[in-house]
């Protein structure tokens, strides 16, 4: 049976039809002796996530539940039930690219709302109708910057996700686009702005950074923008943890923002599908890859939506196209749209604050390697054993530990990247600390369970 809530005006109409002014009058004929004149002895209301977590804990008495502290570009966030309810509707689930606008107004409307919300989150003027994922959005953003500036060289920070850098390298190799990396500060884990300035030249068309970066550190976007713009390059800012946008200042100093929306109700999955985005300042709108949905008027003067710009090779001549994005990602983008709608501006901020609080609670017991400010993940040194050996021990305790960094950063072979989200329970964090260190915590941080 569906639950159909009633508005206050609807309640008044129903009471008037019954000839009463309050719901209590409907029960006035019942003797006081049989009426309950106190509130029911019920616990306070809890959120949907807490209800699911309550029953999951009961179910885990008969199952093997592992606590996970993995992040590194794919994050364990709660997925509201409403997301599946909406995206499983046939008109969304079975539809393809909305080539014929007159019969695809529903799909086009949701894409338009998606673009609007992405612009609000990123501080940009225009957002496209999604990309394959964050990793492929990065080279698309780099090529876009090269086209816009007429300069073919790209500088990218070593604090950008290593696998994103690999994807960029694959694209760049076949585009004849030279890519050079610049370093990070060993103490803070953030951008080495002096190294960036040394490597900048008049042939550089794009500077690419990530915030929060791969180590979880919040980067100096404004300072990087000043260095890039001084030499006529565009600044591309990447994000892999979209929830951070609910709390951190939007990267409005960037020219292009590219990122991954997996955190917005897209389940962690090896190989995807995920949803990437590119958002830009308005003057670069004609360089944006993929599709843009715009608002217009139909022949009767009614509001209507259409594909305003479609610079992909299915729509225009191949040599004129900006990209070869072909798979319809609108369904995955719809998941993120429903997520953003369910949480709203304040809800997303509260979600981000929960992530921040839990990660800092964990950091108060595990000493972070870097001094830079971080969001919901940070780097820790493994004491007395390698991160790989530590993870083997943790698995025996039903704990999936952090990501060993040696495979990506040889200089950090003794360290691992650990993440905490709103899904991370305090008991699990305490268990991780107990399993990794014998040192008691000296700092107390308030955090909800």
UniProtKB/Swiss-Prot annotation:
EC nos: 1.4.4.2
Top-rank EC class of the record's enzyme: oxidoreductase
Keyword Cytoplasm on entry: no
GO MF entry, a single one: glycine dehydrogenase (decarboxylating) activity
Keyword Ribosomal protein tagged: no
Gene3D superfamilies per record: Aspartate Aminotransferase, domain 1, Type I PLP-dependent aspartate aminotransferase-like (Major domain)
Gene Ontology process terms (BP): glycine decarboxylation via glycine cleavage system; nucleoside metabolic process
Signal peptide coordinates: none
Catalytic activity, as annotated: N(6)-[(R)-lipoyl]-L-lysyl-[glycine-cleavage complex H protein] + glycine + H(+) = N(6)-[(R)-S(8)-aminomethyldihydrolipoyl]-L-lysyl-[glycine-cleavage complex H protein] + CO2
One Pfam assignment: GDC-P
Coiled-coil positions: none
Keyword set, alphabetical order: Oxidoreductase
Described purpose of this protein according to its UniProt entry: The glycine cleavage system catalyzes the degradation of glycine. The P protein binds the alpha-amino group of glycine through its pyridoxal phosphate cofactor; CO(2) is released and the remaining methylamine moiety is then transferred to the lipoamide cofactor of the H protein.
Self-association and partners: The glycine cleavage system is composed of four proteins: P, T, L and H. In this organism, the P 'protein' is a heterodimer of two subunits.
PANTHER family, sorted: GLYCINE CLEAVAGE SYSTEM P-PROTEIN (PTHR42806), GLYCINE DEHYDROGENASE (DECARBOXYLATING) (PTHR42806:SF1)
Family, per entry: Belongs to the GcvP family. N-terminal subunit subfamily.
Name under which the protein is recorded: Probable glycine dehydrogenase (decarboxylating) subunit 1
Source organism: Solibacter usitatus (strain Ellin6076)
């Amino acid at each position: 049976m569906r639950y159909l809530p009633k508005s206050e005006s609807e309640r008044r109409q129903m009471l008037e039809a019954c000839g009463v002014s309050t719901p209590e009058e409907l029960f006035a004929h019942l003797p006081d002796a049989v009426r309950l004149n106190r509130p029911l002895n019920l616990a306070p209301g809890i959120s949907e996530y807490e209800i699911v977590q309550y029953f999951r804990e009961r179910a885990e008495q008969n199952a093997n539940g592992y606590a996970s502290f993995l992040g590194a570009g794919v994050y364990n966030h709660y997925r509201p039930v409403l997301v599946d309810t909406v995206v499983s509707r046939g008109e969304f689930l079975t539809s393809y690219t909305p080539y014929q606008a007159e019969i695809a107004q529903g799909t086009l409307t949701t894409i338009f709302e998606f673009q609007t919300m992405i612009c609000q989150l990123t501080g940009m003027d225009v957002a496209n109708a999604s990309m394959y994922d964050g990793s492929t959005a990065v080279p698309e953003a780099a090529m876009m910057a090269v086209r816009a500036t007429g300069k073919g060289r790209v500088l990218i920070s070593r604090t950008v996700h290593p696998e994103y850098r690999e994807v960029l390298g694959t694209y760049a190799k076949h585009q004849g686009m030279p890519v050079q990396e610049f370093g990070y500060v060993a103490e803070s884990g953030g951008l080495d702005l002096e190294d960036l300035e040394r490597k900048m030249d008049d042939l550089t068309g794009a500077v690419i950074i990530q915030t929060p970066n791969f180590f979880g550190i919040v980067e100096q976007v404004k300072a990087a923008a000043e260095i890039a713009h001084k030499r006529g390059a565009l600044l591309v800012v990447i994000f892999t943890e979209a929830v951070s946008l609910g709390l951190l200042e939007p990267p409005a100093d960037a020219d292009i923002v590219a990122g991954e929306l997996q955190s917005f109700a897209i389940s962690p999955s090896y190989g995807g599908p995920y949803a990437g985005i590119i958002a830009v300042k308005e003057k670069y709108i004609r360089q944006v890859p993929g599709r843009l949905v715009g608002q217009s008027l139909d022949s009767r003067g009614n509001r209507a939506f259409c594909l305003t710009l479609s610079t992909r090779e299915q729509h225009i001549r191949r040599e004129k196209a900006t990209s070869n994005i072909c798979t319809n990602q609108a369904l995955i983008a719809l998941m993120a749209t429903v997520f953003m709608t369910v949480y709203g501006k304040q809800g997303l901020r509260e979600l981000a604050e929960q992530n921040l609080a839990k990660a800092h609670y964990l950091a108060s017991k595990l000493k972070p390697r870097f001094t830079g400010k971080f969001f919901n993940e940070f780097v820790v040194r493994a004491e007395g054993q390698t991160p790989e050996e530590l993870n083997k021990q943790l698995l025996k305790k039903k704990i999936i530990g952090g990501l060993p960094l040696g495979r990506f950063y040889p200089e950090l072979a003794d360290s691992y990247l650990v993440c905490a989200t709103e899904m991370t329970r305090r008991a699990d964090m305490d268990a991780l600390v107990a399993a990794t260190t014998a040192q008691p915590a000296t700092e107390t941080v308030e955090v909800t369970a």
